[in-house]
Amino acid sequence: MNLNATLFAQMIVFFVLWWVVARFVWPPLVKALDERSSKIADGLAAAERGKEALALASNEAEQELTKARQEGVQRVAEAEKRAQMSADEIRANAQAEAARIITQAKQDADQQVTSAREVLRAEVAVLAVKGAEQILRREVDAKAHGQLLDQLKAEL
């Protein structure tokens, strides 16, 4: 065989093979590679969107958690304030009740002292009358000397 004819035949076979590959094999390969590239790009984009969504959700969750903590602190502060107000109110009521009881006790004591003084005055008046009777050896008329006895009670 001739080297030129073999080389020429190989070139024709090569170009026919190249044409068949370029016409029937290469487009599906390029299409498959493009589809895979597109899927990879879509996957990367979806991953990026997911990452952004996760960051956004994480920020929102952190904000909600911070808000919940602040509300909890505020509720605790309000509860402490109400408890302090209740304690102050109870303390004020107790002080008012104690003052009322003390005032009532003082009034009762004053009334008992006044009553005891009146009883003592009456007894002293009776004793004074008896003493005067014994001194004078005569009976003093309580009706006749009522004004004098009342004056004596008032002075005692």
Curated annotation (Swiss-Prot):
Query: How does the record classify its membrane topology?
Result: Single-pass membrane protein
Give one GO term, molecular function aspect. proton-transporting ATP synthase activity, rotational mechanism
Sequence intervals crossing the membrane: 7-27
Supply the Gene3D superfamilies for this chain.
6.10.250.1580
Coiled-coil boundaries? none
The family database entries (InterPro entries) matched by this protein are listed as: ATP_synth_B-like_membr_sf, ATP_synth_b/b'su_bac/chlpt, ATP_synth_F0_bsu_bac, ATP_synthase_B_chain
Pfam families according to UniProt: ATP-synt_B (PF00430)
* Alphabetic keyword roster: ATP synthesis, Cell membrane, CF(0), Hydrogen ion transport, Ion transport, Membrane, Transmembrane, Transmembrane helix, Transport
Q: Gene Ontology cellular component? A: plasma membrane; proton-transporting ATP synthase complex
Q: Where is the protein found, in the record's own terms?
A: Cell membrane
Q: How does it assemble?
A: F-type ATPases have 2 components, F(1) - the catalytic core - and F(0) - the membrane proton channel. F(1) has five subunits: alpha(3), beta(3), gamma(1), delta(1), epsilon(1). F(0) has three main subunits: a(1), b(2) and c(10-14). The alpha and beta chains form an alternating ring which encloses part of the gamma chain. F(1) is attached to F(0) by a central stalk formed by the gamma and epsilon chains, while a peripheral stalk is formed by the delta and b chains.
The UniProt similarity line reads: Belongs to the ATPase B chain family.
Briefly state the protein's biological role. F(1)F(0) ATP synthase produces ATP from ADP in the presence of a proton or sodium gradient. F-type ATPases consist of two structural domains, F(1) containing the extramembraneous catalytic core and F(0) containing the membrane proton channel, linked together by a central stalk and a peripheral stalk. During catalysis, ATP synthesis in the catalytic domain of F(1) is coupled via a rotary mechanism of the central stalk subunits to proton translocation. Component of the F(0) channel, it forms part of the peripheral stalk, linking F(1) to F(0).
The record's annotation in HAMAP family points to:
ATP_synth_b_bprime (MF_01398)
| Protein name in the entry | ATP synthase subunit b
